[in-house]
């Protein structure tokens, strides 16, 4: 992928919209679930998996639709991207993720700047994140090689499943993990 203002804009917008949906659907899910955390998580999960399909379909042809420093690192390790370009991608993804959290807060009339209070650390959480990120990259690489058109759907489905089989709800994405620390909502 060649680094251009257009590719960086695609990464920024895609990551921002992803986080707006992650946080916004968490707020909506919690609001509508009446205290049932499983229902709130289900709403959050479905919205996140669905938006990933949409965003990858939209931005994949422009930037590769990484939206994730781990995916970008994978591209570098496979020789598909220069390290210098990957740094620009990762920084853009981080800024986009924070912007998406702020956008979700604004849409729900919440304080824009928050600090998350959910403790998401410990050996199990870190192991879950490693498994989630490995599985995500494996899903992408496998699909790109054998069925490139399936990538958006496979990624959306993998993350949907990952919400439920990992202790961390499958962040699988350092930009998401960092940005979610800036929300005091269900998704934080």
Sequence positions of predicted segments:
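Membrane-interface helix-loop junctions and terminal tails of multi-pass membrane proteins
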Residues: 1-188
């Amino acid at each position: 992928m060649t680094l251009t203002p257009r590719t960086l804009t695609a990464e920024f917008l895609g990551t921002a919209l992803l986080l707006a949906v992650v946080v916004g659907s968490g707020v909506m899910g919690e609001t509508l679930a009446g205290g049932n955390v499983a229902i709130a998580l289900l709403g959050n999960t479905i919205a996140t998996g669905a938006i990933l399909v949409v965003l990858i379909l939209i931005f994949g042809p422009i930037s590769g639709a990484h939206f994730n420093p781990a995916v970008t690192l994978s591209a570098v390790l496979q020789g598909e991207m220069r390290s210098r370009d990957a740094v620009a991608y990762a920084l853009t993804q981080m800024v986009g993720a924070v912007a998406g959290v702020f956008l979700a807060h604004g849409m729900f009339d919440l304080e824009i700047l928050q600090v998350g209070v959910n403790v998401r650390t410990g050996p199990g959480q870190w192991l879950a994140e490693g498994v989630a990120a490995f599985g995500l990259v494996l899903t992408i690489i496998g699909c790109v090689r054998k069925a490139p058109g399936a990538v958006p759907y496979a990624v959306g489905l993998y993350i949907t499943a990952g919400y439920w089989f990992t202790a961390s709800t499958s962040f699988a994405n350092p930009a998401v993990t960092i940005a979610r620390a800036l929300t005091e909502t269900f998704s934080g």
